[in-house]
UniProtKB/Swiss-Prot annotation:
Organism: Leuconostoc citreum (strain KM20)
Function: Specifically methylates the pseudouridine at position 1915 (m3Psi1915) in 23S rRNA.
Protein name: Ribosomal RNA large subunit methyltransferase H
Subunit structure, as described in the record: Homodimer.
GO MF entries: rRNA (pseudouridine-N3-)-methyltransferase activity
Length: 159
């Protein structure tokens, strides 16, 4: 199984990099992890809605280039479905049993995701209505992916 995490922008915070590296290492027992950062677009301070749409479209093109034609794609979006960790774990298991070898997770930039990427997605999930930095969501997501594997193993990690 392959887990691909496509994100917008370069992660600069060392504490987040360290956490992501740790969980990636833990997940490596179960799946190959590929972390892909696509460049973000500079957003003018008082950007119009049209400018924001153009920025998301450019970032969306870069994301689309990294999605495999046979990937199962899950986007993080505020309007996505909120799942308990156990349900998320079962969903990941069901996806692999359905014949997919790669699950691709996508986290957009500070403006969100282009609609075309959302439409390409097989599933949209949300971690709630709170607004969180997209850089922090990388760590939260990768921890939940690790937790999903631990649930599948019956590990006491998930209590």
């Amino acid at each position: 199984m392959n887990i691909k995490l496509i994100t917008v922008g370069k992660l600069k915070e060392h504490y987040l990099k360290d956490g992501i590296a740790e969980y990636s290492k833990r997940i490596a027992r179960f799946a190959k992890v590929e972390l892909i950062e696509v460049p973000d677009e500079k957003t003018p301070e008082h950007a119009s809605q049209a400018q924001n749409q153009q920025i998301m479209a450019k970032e969306g093109e870069r994301i689309a280039d990294k999605i495999g034609s046979r990937d199962y794609v899950i986007v993080l979006a505020i309007e996505g479905k909120q799942l308990p960790s156990e349900t998320f774990s079962k969903k990941m298991s069901d996806i692999t049993l359905s014949g997919y070898s790669t699950i691709t997770f996508i986290i957009g930039g500070s403006l969100g995701l282009d609609e075309r990427i959302k439409q390409r997605a097989d599933m949209a999930i949300s971690f709630g209505l709170l607004t969180l930095p997209h850089q922090l969501m990388r760590l939260v997501l990768i921890e939940q992916i690790y937790r999903a594997f631990m649930i599948q193993q019956g590990s006491p990690y998930h209590k």
